[in-house]
């Protein structure tokens, strides 16, 4: 299967030696224990002399990683049959400051500033498995404004500052590669402005399901709330007002491999400064009158159950990243080259796809 996938995703590489090195590197990512460095891969394949050649292939060669990603995306379109594209941000801690994109960044999930790279991946996902396809580096001011002498050069089109810019650009590009009707984009970007997110994906013609803070200001529309004065209120407060509409929805937890049940309710809303009809979806998991999580989506005609299960695909991706991506070297690139980071990440994404396709089905879903 590895040779077949290599023939597919490397078909557009112009030189046979590039295709051969691509397969060698991919084999190393799948078989080397520990850190997946170029040195360790070269040693494992039994050709220490290949280290310099592989280093050049990743960090200094001219092959276009987007060509390989596009082929990988089309492969996953057939093999995964994704229900959505899922955005997955990744924080990669770094000790130094000279690797591309590295800088001090506040990480909300950790509650502290971390010297790190911040990457955003877009994944093809269904309920059973998922695989990364397209990637962006989210760059801080130091990289976008005036990189210091000796810093890696970043092409201007890649100078995205926010997770939203990275996510939207990568998702639109991926959809263009695979074609067909636009798939929903599932996002959980705590620092993204919900109104800006809605406008960005509306402009791209791509539906979305986005986790939002309970403090998000929304305005109910239509007859859903009798007696409401039509002014904006918080998402949490509005969902609490419609909690009597809740229905039970089942979904599969990809971590525990068990069937879970949540109570959900939805209400048509608008965001400040927008007129596009949206649905605000809330999830309750206990007896509390306040929702545990909430999402906004422009899939206003989709029933609440399928909408919640779309949102839960982010858990599928998180589980696969932890169990598979970290084991095939996704965060192991040690070089300073912008192109090197993208080429390594592209090949690690292919290694992830192979691993997931051949893991026992019982690990992907309960019997």
Show where each model-derived region lies.
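Active-site-proximal, Lys/Arg-enriched surface segment
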Residues: 62-141
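Electropositive, glycine- and tryptophan-enriched low-complexity nucleic-acid-binding patches
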Residues: 56, 110-181, 291-292
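An anionic, glycine-rich sequence signature occurring as long contiguous blocks
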Residues: 143, 209-314
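Gly/serine-rich nucleotide phosphate-binding loop at the start of the catalytic core
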Residues: 1-56
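Domain-level cores of phosphate- or acyl-group-handling catalytic modules
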Residues: 152-221
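Short amphipathic alpha-helical "interface-anchor" segments enriched in bulky aromatics
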Residues: 301-335
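Short, conserved catalytic/metal-binding motifs centered on acidic residues
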Residues: 41, 84-93, 122, 183-192, ...
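A short, flexible helix-boundary coil/loop motif
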Residues: 1-2, 9-18, 139, 228-270, ...
